[in-house]
């Protein structure tokens, strides 16, 4: 009897253990399966989902996110998920290709940047023996607490859209996290709004959004790394640069080796500090309590080593602004062009200004002015510049025809090229207008036209400004305030806005 009783007890224990295990398995199976790319996306996603999702990170610490290419196993992991969250196509350049290879109606792909407009990317050179990387657009938006808020909101909205029954959970979780981001944003604003030194020199050009949002200037340098000493030639030029602007710190993305730090200190007279681009955290660091907030607070502390000390205005080692695109060129380099350079169907950007599509562009330009202009003042300037009633232009360069669609009516004329004119502007830069004249004496307002597209030789235009009139080429050359602007008709308003920010 006693043996039967013990057997019964053991069976009950086994049944209970099975039930507990089964309940845990059901709970685990009920969780949303989420794959994220690298650390910031991982943390932002976990902050939104909380305990309702099983969130994993594809790109582990020690792997360079810029250079990562998914393996077959990685693709299978993504395919098996309910949600896949990444930062932006300019960061994870492989995502679109992977999307095409995955045949799953259950997987939802989330781009954290959503419809955010991004600044132009920069090519980053590494020390000898290391490859650099470049981006068409700068993806490092997560390094500005202000913009991180938008990333979290975009992730939240994507989860709410797919799992409306969990809306309250996602909104509550994200609200708590965004409150912390807003507090961090305030800390940055308070510490940097009255910075004594507005410029900081960095080896990793990842902090342009941070600089833009908090009134600073990021100055990237090349030919130095945290791991190896610069060449004698680079060290000599760096020493000269450091002394010229009395630079106290050069920032690296990781702690410089003691040898590199000693060389820079002894030879160039400059110290090293870390600005962490937050592209990865190790499991050990995460378990130790490191996260977005601890790293960004450390970054602020490091920045203040420079911003709290009054000094000379630091400028870049080389001036890369004096390019043809910015209006700096030699007369001998200017050549004639044919109408074929502007062939295509083009749309005016003016309607997008009127409907608000370009509003974020004005915000960017106002921030870039460092307080000299408000977004409304920038918009007013472009309103005058873009204003036109010619909504579309169709150019057939082979036939030398231009069709103007004005208030819905078409006006088509044949043109001949009559040369170019170099103009000098108040800022000291210059521009070239390419002049054409209609063969039809009844072309009226479109008798004389002038193209300007920031190019000085035969090049297929990506966009252009067009000037026109009925009096003379000389009279039109005087127009400097109104420059109707045209982009390919195939582009959306969002794409045009992105081009204008990066332009």
List each language-model region with its residue ranges.
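Residues at beta-strand starts and edge strands
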Residues: 53, 340, 430-432
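A mature extracytoplasmic/lumenal domain signature
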Residues: 59, 90-91, 113-116, 147, ...
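Extracytoplasmic metal-acquisition and chelation regions
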Residues: 5-10, 17-327, 333, 345, ...
């Amino acid at each position: 009897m006693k043996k039967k009783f013990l057997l019964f007890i053991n069976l009950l224990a086994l049944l209970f253990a099975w039930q507990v295990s089964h309940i845990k398995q059901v709970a685990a199976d009920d969780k949303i399966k989420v794959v994220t790319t690298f650390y910031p996306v991982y943390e932002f996603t976990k902050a939104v989902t909380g305990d309702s999702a099983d969130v994993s990170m594809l790109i582990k610490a020690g792997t360079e996110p810029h250079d990562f290419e998914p393996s077959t196993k990685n693709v299978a992991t993504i395919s098996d998920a309910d949600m896949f969250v990444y930062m932006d196509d300019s960061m994870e350049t492989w995502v679109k290709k992977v999307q095409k290879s995955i045949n799953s109606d259950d997987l939802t792909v989330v781009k954290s940047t959503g419809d955010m407009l991004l600044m132009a990317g920069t090519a980053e050179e590494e020390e000898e023996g290391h490859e650099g990387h470049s981006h068409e657009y700068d993806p490092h938006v997560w390094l500005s607490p202000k913009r991180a808020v938008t990333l979290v909101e975009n992730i939240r909205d994507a989860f709410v859209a797919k799992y409306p029954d969990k809306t309250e959970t996602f909104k509550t979780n994200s609200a708590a996290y965004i409150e912390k981001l807003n507090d961090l944003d305030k800390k940055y604003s308070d510490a940097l709004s009255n910075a004594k030194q507005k410029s900081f020199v960095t080896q990793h050009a990842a902090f342009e959004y941070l600089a833009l949002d908090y009134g600073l200037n990021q100055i990237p340098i090349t030919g130095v790394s945290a791991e190896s000493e610069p060449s004698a030639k680079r060290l000599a030029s760096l020493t000269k640069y450091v002394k010229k602007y009395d630079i106290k710190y050069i920032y690296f993305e990781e702690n410089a080796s003691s040898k590199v730090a000693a060389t820079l200190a002894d030879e160039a007279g400059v110290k090293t500090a870390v600005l962490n681009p937050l592209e990865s955290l190790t499991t050990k660091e995460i378990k130790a309590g490191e996260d977005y907030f601890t790293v960004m607070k450390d970054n602020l502390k490091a920045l203040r080593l420079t911003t709290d000390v009054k000094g000379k205005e630091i400028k870049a080692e080389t001036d890369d602004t004096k390019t043809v695109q910015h209006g700096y060129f030699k007369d001998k380099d200017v050549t004639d062009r044919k109408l074929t350079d502007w062939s295509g169907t083009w749309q005016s950007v003016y309607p997008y200004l009127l409907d608000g599509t370009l509003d974020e562009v004005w915000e960017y330009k106002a921030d870039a002015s460092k307080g000299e202009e408000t977004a409304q003042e920038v918009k007013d300037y472009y309103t005058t510049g873009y204003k036109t009633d010619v909504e579309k232009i169709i150019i057939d360069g082979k036939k030398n025809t231009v069709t103007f669609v004005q208030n819905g009516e078409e006006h088509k004329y044949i043109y001949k090229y009559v040369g170019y004119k170099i103009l000098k502007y108040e800022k000291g830069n210059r521009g070239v207008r390419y002049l054409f004249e209609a063969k039809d004496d009844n072309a009226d307002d479109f008798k004389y036209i002038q193209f300007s597209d920031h190019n000085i030789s035969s090049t297929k235009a990506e966009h252009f400004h067009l000037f026109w009139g009925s009096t003379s080429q000389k009279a039109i050359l005087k127009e400097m305030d109104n420059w109707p602007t045209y982009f390919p008709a195939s582009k959306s308003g969002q794409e045009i806005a992105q081009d204008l920010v990066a332009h």
